[in-house]
Structures are given as C-alpha cells and as structure tokens.
Amino acid sequence: MASNDKGLEEIPEGQIESNYDEITDSFDAMDLKPELLRGVYAYGFERPSAIQQRAILPIIKGNDVIAQAQSGTGKTATFSISALQKLDPNVKGCQALILAPTRELAQQIQKVVVAIGDFMNIECHACIGGTNVREDMKALQEGPQVVVGTPGRVQDMIQRRVLRTDNLKMFILDEADEMLSRGFTEQIYDIFQLLPQSTQVVLLSATMPQDVLEVTTKFMRDPVRILVKKQELTLEGIKQFYIAVEKEEWKLDTLSDLYETVTITQAVIFCNTRRKVDWLTDKLTARDFTVSAMHGDMEQAQRDVIMKEFRSGSSRVLIATDLLARGIDVQQVSLVINYDLPANRENYIHRIGRGGRFGRKGVAINFVTADDVRMMREIEQFYSTQIEEMPMNVAGKFNHVDISLD
C-alpha cells in the first residue's frame, strides 16, 4: 500500500492503459493448490475467462492490481481464486478483506468464495449492514480467513477491533466505481488508514472515473494495470432491441403485449426508481401476471427471500432498481427489459450483462421514448454496439423473438 500523490492528469479518465499482457489460458497452468483447483472445476469452470487469464497470476504473485472489466466477465472468481491461493487455512483470522457496494453483491461473493474453497477448510463471513451486529461480532471472533462486506459495516468492525487486521495479506475493492459513487469514499479512505502498510491492494472497476483513479494513486504501489477492452467483453451474445414508445404511459401496454409473444426462461425488468418498481408490480399483478419486486427500501430478510425464489426459478420475472444490477447472478436470466433506460451509460452493461453471463445467449429490450433517444445513442457509441428496432409483423404485433438458451 502506498501513500503518494503523483500527477493524476497523466491518466485519461474513463479507461486505464494496460501495462501487462501475459495470458495463462488454462487453470492447470496457474500452479494452484490441488484442493483449490478441484474447487475451481467443481464450481463448473472449464477454462479461464479473459480477465482470469490475465489477472489471477499477478495477484497471486503479490502485485497490486487494477483490473478494469465489466460485470459478467468472471471478476468475482478472479479475485476469489487468487485470494484462496494465498491464504493459509491453518491460520485463523482475516487474511483477505473484500469490499463490495451492495449487500447482495457481498453475499454473492461470499457464496463464490465458499463454493470454490469447498475443499480447503476455510471460513468466509459476510459482514453487511441490515444484519445483527452481535452476530457479526461473534462470527468475526471465530477468525474467518476471508471477510467480505459493505464499507460501513466493515469500517465499524475494524474500529471496534473485532475485525483484526494483523494477519491481513490482501484488500480487494470490487465495483470500486459504484462504491465511490454511492458515497462510501470516506469509509474506504478510513479503512485504508486502518490496514497494515504491507497489505496488497486489488481494485476492480468497470469504469475509471477520477475518484477511482485517486484511490489507485494514493493507496497502490506500482500497480499492474489490466484492461479487458469493451470490445472484448461487452455485449457479445446479447441481442439488443429497442421499442419506440410514444408516451411513458404506453409502456405498460407494450410490456403486456411483449409478455404474450415472448417465451421467457427468466427475466429481469429494470426501472429507475423504487416507486416505479412498486407501481409496475401492482399494475402487472392486477393484470394477472406473476412478478416479484426488489429494491433498496426492503428489509434485508425480504430481499433474501425474493432472491432465493428467483434463483430457484419459482418466480420467473423480477422487477428491480439498479441496486440489483450489481449483485445478481442467475444462470437462467435470458431476457432483460429496461422499462426505463438507465440514468447513466455505465449501468447499461451491469443491467444487460445479467442476460448473457459467461458467454450465454440473452436478449435485452429497451423501451425508448422520444426523450430517451439521445441516451440510447450515447450507449451505442460508448459500447460500440447497435441496438436494433424490435421486429414487428404486419398486424403490429411483435414478432416471436427466440429467447432460448441453446
């Protein structure tokens, strides 16, 4: 961990430049512990994704690493595998600390760490707001080797000296851009001050705004910079359409028409506000569509139940705000509908990346009013992609779009 303020102006905002291009194209060639390798294959990975091929080895070697890659590219497994390789299962106490912007994402990361580390005899605890502080303290006193959490609760636990950092080897910031844009900057800076100087820092971010670059220059030592380019990842395998909707009020009927023509495995519908999520849920329920809804106003326990039902497939359609775009990995999501276009272009990839994770096929449909056209063009330009108009037949009905996952 470094503390210097070298000129930020040298780094163009938005994208880092890679300074590392070595690729390891199989997990076998990474020299992982046998019990970790077994966990990687048991989890269902066959070969490393673009980010895994580039980032796992420099992290294992102990370099500070900045990795810029979008959601759905295998980032979570990248740092989970690296952290598990470096841990000593015989030592109790936090050796890898992972920060995430939302509770859902923290829990998702915990599941991945536990699953990949299944044969290693390690403990991983999720330290998140909205849960009982006493239970958190009790779990941390047992000395789990990996702790993943949201910035507020993690900072609190370190300050109470319940989360000890004496054995800490690695500090990982996932979705750094989102954490900083959610106002966690102060907590993150405080956490850095509380960590041993020797801690290795790994930062992952889809975008590189100025506030993220400041963190990298202040707290990282000669970091290895890895950029998985937008073209390499983004929206391959995801068909993108838009439906021109003349007025906001017509979106609901458009959605009902879609429901009748589209065969869906599972779908997520994104709205920009919590109120809109509740409103749309009520309207669709009144029309006899089965949907569930999720947003940040809900109690944690309620959110957990909804996610569980959605993951198991007992609920097929989930209406959500962007909160969800960062913490959900449901294998079967084949359709994403942007009832509202996202307020910023970075969130577009997080939303529709749900619909084609790890190279699976998916479809994204955007409802676009006259006011949204400019934003849609910006999104197309930013991701070098094309969003085509949804095909209609002569009767003005939507053509059947095949959203199967074969």
Curated annotation (Swiss-Prot):
It holds the Pfam family Helicase_C. It catalyses: ATP + H2O = ADP + phosphate + H(+). Coiled coil: none annotated. A motif (DEAD box) lies at residues 174-177. Residues 237-398 form the Helicase C-terminal domain. Its EC number is 3.6.4.13. Residues 56-226 form the Helicase ATP-binding domain. It is found in: Cytoplasm. One of its GO terms (biological process) is cytoplasmic translational initiation. Signal peptide: none annotated. A motif (Q motif) lies at residues 25-53. Keywords: ATP-binding, Cytoplasm, Helicase, Hydrolase, Initiation factor, Nucleotide-binding, Protein biosynthesis, RNA-binding. SMART domains: DEXDc, HELICc. One of its GO terms (molecular function) is translation initiation factor activity. ATP binds at A69, Q70, S71, G72, T73, G74, K75, T76. One of its GO terms (cellular component) is cytoplasmic stress granule. It is an enzyme of class 3 (hydrolase). ATP-dependent RNA helicase which is a subunit of the eIF4F complex involved in cap recognition and is required for mRNA binding to ribosome. In the current model of translation initiation, eIF4A unwinds RNA secondary structures in the 5'-UTR of mRNAs which is necessary to allow efficient binding of the small ribosomal subunit, and subsequent scanning for the initiator codon. PANTHER family: ATP-DEPENDENT RNA HELICASE DBP3. Component of the eIF4F complex, which composition varies with external and internal environmental conditions. It is composed of at least eIF4A, eIF4E and eIF4G. The Q motif is unique to and characteristic of the DEAD box family of RNA helicases and controls ATP binding and hydrolysis. Belongs to the DEAD box helicase family. eIF4A subfamily. This is ATP-dependent RNA helicase eIF4A. It comes from Aspergillus fumigatus (strain ATCC MYA-4609 / CBS 101355 / FGSC A1100 / Af293). The lineage of its organism: Eukaryota, Fungi, Dikarya, Ascomycota, Pezizomycotina.
